[in-house]
Amino acid sequence: MTDMTIPLTFTDAAAKKVKNLIIEEENQDLKLRVYITGGGCSGFQYGFTFDEKVNDGDLTIENDGVKLVIDPMSLQYLIGGTVDYTEGLEGSRFVVHNPNATTTCGCGSSFSI
């Protein structure tokens, strides 16, 4: 991605957690896929899964040797956002900080635009 602005930030904390999970799974082909689906209390919700494939049109962002993959439909809702990993009172989880969301539910897993 030379001379191209990356439309989504993949934090060091998220990359470190993905790297540790890949080591646990013993599968170096795994990538973290973030996606948007309809649902949740605000209309859309974030999803995370491990995937071995990168489909045509997917955006791949690499940090510390691990890859984050986003499909084109989901990317349009995530531009300018950040995929992070947090540990706190609510437990540990991957989170999306999305500047495009006009409302977000209390748990942060669903949003509306």
Curated annotation (Swiss-Prot):
Free-text remark on how the cofactor is bound: Binds 1 iron-sulfur cluster per subunit.
Keywords annotated in UniProt: Iron, Iron-sulfur, Metal-binding
Iron-sulfur in keyword set: yes
Stored SUPFAM superfamilies: HesB-like domain (SSF89360)
GO cellular component labels: cytosol
Sites where the protein binds iron-sulfur cluster: 41, 105, 107
GO BP terms in the entry: iron-sulfur cluster assembly
Record bears the keyword Metal-binding: yes
Pfam families: Fe-S_biosyn
Domain of life: Bacteria
GO molecular function: 2 iron, 2 sulfur cluster binding; 4 iron, 4 sulfur cluster binding; iron ion binding
InterPro entries documented for this protein: FeS_biogenesis, FeS_cluster_insertion, FeS_cluster_insertion_CS, FeS_cluster_insertion_RrpA, HesB-like_dom_sf
Cofactor: iron-sulfur cluster
Binding partners and assembly: Homodimer.
Annotated NCBIfam families: iron-sulfur cluster assembly accessory protein (TIGR00049), PRK13623.1 (NF010147)
Annotated family: Belongs to the HesB/IscA family.
PANTHER family: IRON-SULFUR CLUSTER ASSEMBLY 2 HOMOLOG, MITOCHONDRIAL (PTHR43011:SF1)
Biological role stated in the UniProt entry: Required for insertion of 4Fe-4S clusters for at least IspG.
The protein's name: Iron-sulfur cluster insertion protein ErpA
Organism for this UniProt entry: Mannheimia succiniciproducens (strain KCTC 0769BP / MBEL55E)
